[in-house]
């Protein structure tokens, strides 16, 4: 028991060292996942020995440990393949090589430079969905890695690899759930892709393509409040250019302006919000001195959150004991979950999650 606890502590200390170093090279990311793989193996062995708690941590079930171990092994092998490619000297962060990004669409590919694509259903500005396309998609095969660009048309999000067009998101799937007319328009940067013939989505061909066209997709992080809006997993959103191919549908050159969102009577997952931007947040509550130390320790994890406040407290608190609060904001809920899964918060600090209008 003591020996296996010591091994787990040693591995987790090395993992924490990698987080604090916050390096952006591929070698460090491979080392990170090797350590995670060792951690999974220790947890699996501990559960086999009938141990339910190890180093004050709950030991996952055998099935959960085995499933995560398989995912980690697959990701590590993909990183090894990437390390043998011309892209090994590029910048690679913890977030870009995270399991969450690896398993997001398109699955089992590395992805960089997320771009927000907004689909407006039924010509209703309050009925929109946000999706994430990627300027750089790294297709991992047995011993090779190929870089392709994520593209968009009226049908959905796709990439072209080896003369094969692969869709990883069809807009008609969500249109069946959220659209009454089964019609929509796609907003990318300052341009809008519409279907001029107004044909139903179930009659749209997903194979016929016209001549390629190019559009400049500017980064428009539009997380404006809507009656229903979802972010699929955006990464850092960069200004970029990428080619866009279309089916029978055309590109409307009218500017998006501010008409795509509404700032009144908005909701965010059932909460009434009247703001142009809603962000996931975490409140860290505890002793002000402890929070000050925690803020310093969290600086190396700046890729895992958007902004962090100074320590503050409620002035209306009559209890006399001024509980400090640090507010951390995130671009997406996925980034927040990655933060909570990665960063070790002391047990004396209370964690509260929610959303905030910014």
Curated annotation (Swiss-Prot):
Keyword check for Ubl conjugation: yes
Gene Ontology biological-process annotations: DNA replication; DNA-templated transcription; regulation of DNA replication; viral DNA genome replication
Gene3D superfamilies xref list: 3.30.70.330, E2 (early) protein, N terminal domain, subdomain 1, Papillomavirus E2 early protein domain
The record's account of how the chain is modified after translation: Phosphorylated. Sumoylation plays a regulatory role in E2 transcriptional activity.
Ranges where the record places region DNA-binding domain: 278-358
Region described as Disordered: spans on this chain: 203-238
Principal subcellular localization: host cell
Domain of life: Viruses
Cross-link Glycyl lysine isopeptide (Lys-Gly) (interchain with G-Cter in SUMO) placement: 285
SUPFAM superfamilies hit by this protein: E2 regulatory, transactivation domain, Viral DNA-binding domain
The keyword Repressor is assigned to this record: yes
Pfam families the record matches: PPV_E2_C, PPV_E2_N
GO cellular component: host cell nucleus
Biased composition, class Polar residues, residue ranges: 215-225
Entry's Gene Ontology molecular function annotations: DNA binding; DNA-binding transcription factor activity; nucleotide binding
Region of interest called Transactivation domain, as start-end residue ranges on this chain: 1-200
Keyword annotations from UniProtKB, A to Z: Activator, DNA replication, DNA-binding, Early protein, Host nucleus, Isopeptide bond, Phosphoprotein, Repressor, Transcription, Transcription regulation, Ubl conjugation
Role played: Plays a role in the initiation of viral DNA replication. A dimer of E2 interacts with a dimer of E1 in order to improve specificity of E1 DNA binding activity. Once the complex recognizes and binds DNA at specific sites, the E2 dimer is removed from DNA. E2 also regulates viral transcription through binding to the E2RE response element (5'-ACCNNNNNNGGT-3') present in multiple copies in the regulatory regions of the viral genome. Activates or represses transcription depending on E2RE's position with regards to proximal promoter elements including the TATA-box.
Record note on quaternary structure: Binds DNA as homodimer. Interacts with protein E1; this interaction greatly increases E1 DNA-binding activity. Interacts with protein L1; this interaction enhances E2-dependent replication and transcription activation. Interacts with protein L2; this interaction inhibits E2 transcriptional activity but not DNA replication function E2. Interacts with protein E7; this interaction inhibits E7 oncogenic activity. Interacts with host TAF1; this interaction modulates E2-dependent transcriptional regulation. Interacts with host BRD4; this interaction mediates E2 transcriptional activation function.
Family assignment from sequence similarity: Belongs to the papillomaviridae E2 protein family.
Descriptive protein name: Regulatory protein E2
Organism: Human papillomavirus 58
Name of the gene: E2
